[in-house]
Amino acid sequence: MNKGEDNLVRTSITVPEQLLQKVNELIASGYFASRSEIFRQALREYLQRIEWTERVGDEEYFGALTYVFQHERAEPELVKVQHEFTDVIISTTHIHVSPEKCLEVLLLQGPGKRIAELAKRIRGVRGVEQAKLTVVSSEGE
């Protein structure tokens, strides 16, 4: 158990049935001990990524922001956001996943704070279902 987790609190969440089925399959395969453990680990990882966006400064980073979205619902707002961040977006790739969904990958270079703000804005667009930011320092650290 991690430090600070000795006072666990019970809560409940609502997830799509297919997602819960995948969680149960991972547990049955031995990847995780329980549903609680998989959700705790996923939350820790997600919160660490979000916390980076809150503390990063103006150091230069390279990165990729990959996201899946509902085409008709999100695309107009996504285009607007992308136009506000042309200073850090160096390339965009767009793939049609299905008639309703698309995947985009933005290749990024620039101040970490600006990249973090872009990721925050993309995640906040209604219709974005998943978004993952991966960054590396230009210093190689």
UniProtKB/Swiss-Prot annotation:
GO terms for molecular function: DNA binding; DNA-binding transcription factor activity; nickel cation binding. It comes from the Archaea. Its cofactor is Ni(2+). Keywords: DNA-binding, Metal-binding, Nickel, Transcription, Transcription regulation. Ni(2+) binds at H83, H94, H96, C102. Binds 1 nickel ion per subunit. InterPro entries: Acetolactate_synth/TF_NikR_C (IPR027271), ACT-like_dom_sf (IPR045865), Arc_rbn_hlx_hlx (IPR013321), CopG (IPR002145), CopG/NikR_regulator (IPR050192), Ni_resp_reg_NikR (IPR022988), Ribbon_hlx_hlx (IPR010985), TF_NikR_Ni-bd_C (IPR014864). Signal peptide: none annotated. One of its GO terms (biological process) is response to nickel cation. Transcriptional regulator. HAMAP family: NikR. Belongs to the transcriptional regulatory CopG/NikR family. This is Putative nickel-responsive regulator. The lineage of its organism: Archaea, Methanobacteriati, Methanobacteriota, Methanomada group, Methanopyri.
